[in-house]
Amino acid sequence: HFELIKLYGAAVPYVDDIAMKENVNPQVSNVDENGNYIYIWDKIVEDLQFAYDNLPDTWTEAGRVNKWAAGAMLAKVKMYQSSPYNGKNGTSNHWTEVKTILEDVIANGKDNKGTKFRLADTYEELYTAGESDWTGESVFDVQAAVSGTVEQTANINGAWHIGFSGALGTGGWGFYQPSYDMVNAHIVDANGLPKMDDSYRNDPALSTLDENNLPHTDLTVYTDPRLDVSTGRFETPFLDWTVPNALDGWVRDVSNGGLYLNKKNIPRKADKGSLSNTTQTNSTAKNFHLI
């Protein structure tokens, strides 16, 4: 429901577990029997508050949501609830509650291995299969695993266009490319500080095509080092695969998706067969970090 609000606003109906059990395609109104609007934010907060109040600190099953993951998600929802995402009600103020919850999570939170939350040693570590799951920084993950033998593990119910999201050069289908705006937001000044005035939006693209349709990247521009963990760029190493130097084999349609490559959730070539699927190389054991 939280993700639906992000996309469509708070007018989406609230479908609870009971309605789903009674009907696989429930028809749910966003008003109650008296015609009053059902405020979906309150329903989401109520659900997460119950989880935060009642879940244990840790579970023996590593991937289950514990008290601290629920608390962090509750705080995130309350932040969005107090923002323009809440439409005309975006002036509602839950920041004091958010601060209280997050102070509790920071002071006392731990993962299911009992590791107290902390910042990972490096940003890259968060997106390295086998290391990223239990750095202490991951609060709420979508768990992932591969056997090394099962084919098409990235495809839920045959959803090919979702599963093959990696760069073409790594076995993906080239979808979900980083945008110009996202990449330019990593431009920094000589002191390593971001351009807080949004002037990066008017800066030239860091990667361009020459008259022969060959891609080039301007590496003289100062950028936040996290950029090359998140985004593949031409003329820079793409993990341990190779250095992309031509469109062919890397970009599906440059006129549609641009020149940047999906990278941070893509497995390394060395992972193939152990932390990545043997047949579809972009299937990976990297967890997806929600928080």
Write out the residue ranges for each language-model feature.
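An aromatic- and glycine-enriched ligand-binding surface/loop that stacks and positions planar moieties
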Residues: 41, 49-50, 64, 68, ...
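Aromatic-anchored glycine-rich loop motif in surface-exposed flexible loops
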Residues: 1-66, 78-93, 97, 245-248, ...
